[in-house]
Amino acid sequence: MESLTLQPISKINGQINLPGSKSVSNRALLLAALASGTTKLTNLLDSDDIRHMLNALKALGVEYKLSANKTECEVTGLGRAFEPNEALELFLGNAGTAMRPLAAALCLGQGEFVLTGEPRMKERPIGHLVTALKAAGADVEYLENENYPPLKIKGTGLHGGTVEIDGSISSQFLTAFLMAAPLSTQETTIKIVGDLVSKPYIDITLDIMATFGVKIENQNYQTFVVPANQTYVAPGDFLVEGDASSASYFLAAAAIKGGEVKVTGIGKKSIQGDVQFADALAAMGTEIEWGDDYVIARKGELNAIDMDFNHIPDAAMTIATAALFAKGTTSIRNVYNWRVKETDRLAAMATELRKVGAVVEEGEDYITITPPASLQHASIDTYDDHRMAMCFSLVALSDTPVTINDPGCTSKTFPDYFDKLKELSC
């Protein structure tokens, strides 16, 4: 297995122009494909998850032109649901932002489809979405284990009506259903069961859907009413925001070691909830400055925090490694859905934090971290999880090197992450 040893980083300073958001990129690509007209996306993320979506759309008959650097994409929309001439098997890697929304969208048109992916994808639940789709008339079956991919889908259209979706495991189930619902033949009423996790990700979905011209009534995130027989309309130009989750590593690096780091592509006007990560850093003692399309972090004296991170679970992972540099015991609460991400992130994070010397308590939906007097050199296993690799790179901001196993797993969302980190540390 390939590994990368990061030597201690003595200073952090500079500016990072963020790659496009994974969440925004894949949502916008799918809606551009379904829309009438042509959409030109700029600052598209070039990564594995986006590549899986693009490959699937091409197989489904969508025409697009991708720039040489793969960050601009002109999509010619179908103006309707997908209706390929032959049965298709679509391999979606470990891309939840492709698997869940495509599973819903493929129910709308005609054709037979198998959706599959990497072994870890077959361990990531999809049952709550499938149950809701079936209630709206979909023909979906599990090919291996109940409630998990791979799926076999027969396009029959969705007839709307009232459906329930459990919101407590993943917001992607609701996102997927919301994006399909406007093309249903009757009005759809979606009722949320349980507490809705990662609510800011639903805001991303609603914002992009509005940009593509459809109407939804949001009743306090408990009920969503979606009129039937709508058409997505291409907005023309669509700028993909920088990835706020990716910003977290650089902002945290400044907080730990600063210097001053400015990240551009997100700011106080961002539609991504993960920009609130900067507020968590501020609560720890970091100096934060906001602009419309940038955030600046400057070093502060970091103190432990005890906080509910249900709304920003991805960025919360960065707090777990920043906690190694804070005074006191940090508690990250209400993050059960870490367990159903690219890996079981609660178990993985606890295991790897202990390797560098931290005292860790892992609960069903929380983790507490007490830093050691000095960090230990360790080989960090990344579990084929991009965020594990990026989070633990921050250990090098101490006086101790850190070895990252399988650093290439960052290709899921940020292929040149380690190059960018090096630029800031020169």
From Swiss-Prot:
GO CC annotations, alphabetized: cytoplasm
Localization of this protein: Cytoplasm
Keyword Amino-acid biosynthesis: yes
Active site: 314
Catalytic reactions on record: 3-phosphoshikimate + phosphoenolpyruvate = 5-O-(1-carboxyvinyl)-3-phosphoshikimate + phosphate
EC number(s) reported in the record: 2.5.1.19
The entry's keywords: Amino-acid biosynthesis, Aromatic amino acid biosynthesis, Cytoplasm, Transferase
GO-annotated biological processes: amino acid biosynthetic process; aromatic amino acid family biosynthetic process; chorismate biosynthetic process
Binding residues for phosphoenolpyruvate: 22, 96, 124, 172, 345, 387, 412
Ligand binding (3-phosphoshikimate): 22-23, 27, 170-172, 198, 314, 337, 341
Keyword Cell membrane annotated: no
CDD domains linked to this entry: EPSP_synthase
One Pfam family cited in the UniProt record for this chain: EPSP_synthase
Signal peptide: none
Domain of life the protein comes from: Bacteria
Family statement drawn from the similarity comment of this UniProt entry: Belongs to the EPSP synthase family.
Described function: Catalyzes the transfer of the enolpyruvyl moiety of phosphoenolpyruvate (PEP) to the 5-hydroxyl of shikimate-3-phosphate (S3P) to produce enolpyruvyl shikimate-3-phosphate and inorganic phosphate.
Assembly notes: Monomer.
Protein name: 3-phosphoshikimate 1-carboxyvinyltransferase
